[in-house]
Structures are given as structure tokens and as C-alpha cells.
């Protein structure tokens, strides 16, 4: 039976079945191939899409805009300072108004409850471009990238380790995605940075049906052994105060992905992924502030790892992730 997701919200992966998630990944792969060959057919001509960004963005905004334009849709970007949302107008009222003007709405912002409310009252499909709790569109891109870089394998045959802050929206979403798709995921982090226990329990229940393997560990060598992919994210998420940096850097330093971690996988074909942005040098404002405050010892190790001539970046069109292949 054909899969139809017409008029469905996409707020979190927990709302979707494994078959529906696989359908979206396959669709993205086919659209990407069609664009590359010059045969993409526009199916959204005459449609209008609102992009609400209460948090700033580079890749997510560009991905939504380019994808919409490629499919023939028009977009309206509503930035952090360009609307009355949350100031003079509630999200419920905003949803009702925009739902009458637009055919779909993307939201990137704060609490998951906000995008859920938007989805409840808009009357048109709403897509989650990131909340504090989840980042489902990023996970679709990540799973697609994994398949592209593991030819001949299916998602249940793949394993990956996520190192760092596993309680953030990426840790949460990767765990959900892996559970849904029957994958082997290892969340490698200090115990205080593991995902919420209720979500872990929910994912383990899903895994009991899909065959997924979920491991939470503080031991880096145990967590990364024989994985196909290593994944990490920034240690300090958007909106977190600078006062949190010192403790975070101290706690996360052992979970930095560097050459030692690559070697510990014992997999010569392991690949590295980062959802970006990444602070790996002093070439950004935040990077300079961190280096001035906490030094560059660990970064220098990372620079040598990233600059090795046998490593190369391969940005994947419409995925938002960067694999590094040895």
C-alpha cells in the first residue's frame, strides 16, 4: 500500500512509523538524484510556505528555502525580530492567521510545546526545524547521509556513536531515530548529560519492537568500538549562558572526537559527522572567546585531526551534515 503523508505535521519522529520515516528518506534520495540529473519535477507550484525562525539559522533556513524553490513554492522568512509572535500575539492566534495565508509552516525556536500548538491550530502542515527538545528534519538528513556513505547496507545494519551532550535536541532525536529504524546507537557522555529517563524508556520500548540497540555509557572506548559513524555536536547549545562554558568544557573534554577516538573504533572505514556549526578553531567570535577563556590545547589536537591529508570533507547537498571519511 502506498504511503501518503499529505497534510501531516512533522513535529517529532515519535509521531511517525519506521515505514513512514523510510519513505521520507527514500523520497529525499530520489529528489536529490532528480535535481542532480536535471529531471526534478516541481510539485509545489503555486504553494506558499512560511518559515518562522525564532532562533537564527544558516543551514536549516537555506535547506528549507532551496528545497521549496526547487519544488516551485514561494517562501516568506519571518526572523527573530520580524514579527509580533510571542510579543503582541500568541502562537495560537499566529497559527490561525498564517494557516489562512500559507499552505505550510516551518518553525524553528524554543519549547516543543510551541511547535505542537502551532501544529494544532494552523490547519496546514507544520514542520519542526528545531526546538529545544527535538530536531527531526536534521535526523532525516543524517540517516540519509549514512545510507549514502554505506552503500549496500540498510539502516538496521548500521551503528553509530554520539559523543558529547546527549541530553540536547540532537541526542534526543538521534536516539529516537535510531530506535525507530532498528539501528545500533551508543550515546557516549557523562551520566549527567544522558537523555531524560522517560524518553530513554520510551525509546527502549520502541527498540523492543524494531530490534534497535540502545547503549548509554560514559566509557569512550566501549561506546565507539566497531561503529560505522562517529557523531558529535557543539558542547554549548544555542541560548545557554557563558557561565555554563567552564563546567561544560571540563566535563566534555574527554568526549572530544579526535584521532585517539578514531583509532579506538578499530574500524578503518569509520566516518565522522557533525550537524554544525562546529567550534574547532578561533576563526569565529564564539571560537575566539572560548580559546581566550579556556586555552587551545584540546583544539590543537583537533586541528591536527581535521587537517590530516587522508581526511576530506564531503558536504552533502540537502543534508545539512558533513561526513569525514578516512
From Swiss-Prot:
Transmembrane segments: none annotated. It comes from Escherichia coli O6:K15:H31 (strain 536 / UPEC). L-ornithine binds at residues 169, 233, 237-238. This is Ornithine carbamoyltransferase. GO terms for biological process: arginine biosynthetic process via ornithine; citrulline biosynthetic process; L-arginine biosynthetic process. It is found in: Cytoplasm. Belongs to the aspartate/ornithine carbamoyltransferase superfamily. OTCase family. Pathway: Amino-acid biosynthesis; L-arginine biosynthesis; L-arginine from L-ornithine and carbamoyl phosphate: step 1/3. It comes from the Bacteria. One of its GO terms (cellular component) is cytoplasm. PANTHER family: ORNITHINE CARBAMOYLTRANSFERASE (PTHR45753:SF2), ORNITHINE CARBAMOYLTRANSFERASE, MITOCHONDRIAL (PTHR45753). The lineage of its organism: Bacteria, Pseudomonadati, Pseudomonadota, Gammaproteobacteria, Enterobacterales. One of its GO terms (molecular function) is amino acid binding. Carbamoyl phosphate binds at residues 57-60, 84, 108, 135-138, 275-276. It catalyses: carbamoyl phosphate + L-ornithine = L-citrulline + phosphate + H(+). NCBIfam families: orni_carb_tr. Reversibly catalyzes the transfer of the carbamoyl group from carbamoyl phosphate (CP) to the N(epsilon) atom of ornithine (ORN) to produce L-citrulline.
Amino acid at each position: 500500500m502506498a504511503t501518503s503523508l499529505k497534510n501531516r505535521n512533522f513535529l517529532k519522529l515519535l509521531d511517525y512509523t519506521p515505514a513512514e520515516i523510510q519513505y521520507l528518506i527514500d523520497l529525499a534520495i530520489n529528489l536529490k538524484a532528480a535535481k542532480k540529473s536535471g529531471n526534478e519535477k516541481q510539485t509545489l507550484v503555486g504553494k506558499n510556505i512560511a518559515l518562522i525562525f525564532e532562533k537564527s539559522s544558516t543551514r536549516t533556513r537555506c535547506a528549507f528555502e532551496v528545497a521549496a524553490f526547487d519544488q516551485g513554492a514561494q517562501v516568506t522568512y519571518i526572523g527573530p525580530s520580524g514579527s509580533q509572535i510571542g510579543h503582541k500575539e500568541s502562537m495560537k492566534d499566529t497559527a490561525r492567521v498564517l494557516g489562512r495565508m500559507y499552505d505550510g509552516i516551518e518553525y524553528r525556536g524554543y519549547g516543543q510545546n510551541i511547535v505542537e500548538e502551532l501544529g494544532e491550530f494552523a490547519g496546514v502542515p507544520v514542520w519542526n526545524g528545531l526546538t529545544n527538545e527535538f530536531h527531526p528534519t536534521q535526523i532525516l538528513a543524517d540517516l540519509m547521509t549514512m545510507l549514502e556513505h554505506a552503500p549496500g547496507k540498510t539502516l538496521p545494519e548500521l551503528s553509530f556513536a554520539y559523543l558529547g551532550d546527549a541530553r540536547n535536541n540532537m541526542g534526543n532525536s538521534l536516539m529516537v531515530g535510531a530506535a525507530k529504524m532498528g539501528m545500533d546507537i551508543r550515546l557516549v557522555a557523562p551520566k549527567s548529560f544522558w537523555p531524560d529517563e522517560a524518553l530513554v524508556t520510551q525509546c527502549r520500548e520502541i527498540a523492543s519492537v524494531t530490534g534497535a540497540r540502545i547503549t548509554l555509557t560514559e566509557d569512550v572506548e566501549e561506546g565507539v568500538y566497531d561503529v560505522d559513524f562517529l557523531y558529535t555536536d557543539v558542547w554549548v547549545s544555542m541560548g545557554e549562558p557563558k557561565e555554563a562554558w567552564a563546567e561544560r568544557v571540563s566535563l566534555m573534554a574527554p568526549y572530544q572526537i579526535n584521532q585517539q577516538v578514531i583509532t579506538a573504533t578499530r574500524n578503518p572505514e569509520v566516518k565522522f559527522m557533525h550537524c554544525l556549526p562546529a567550534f574547532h578553531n578561533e576563526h569565529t567570535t564564539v571560537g575566539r572567546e572560548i580559546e581566550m577563556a579556556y586555552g587551545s590545547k584540546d583544539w590543537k589536537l583537533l586541528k591536527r585531526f581535521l587537517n590530516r591529508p587522508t581526511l576530506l570533507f564531503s558536504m552533502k547537498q540537502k543534508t545539512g551534515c558533513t561526513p569525514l571519511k578516512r
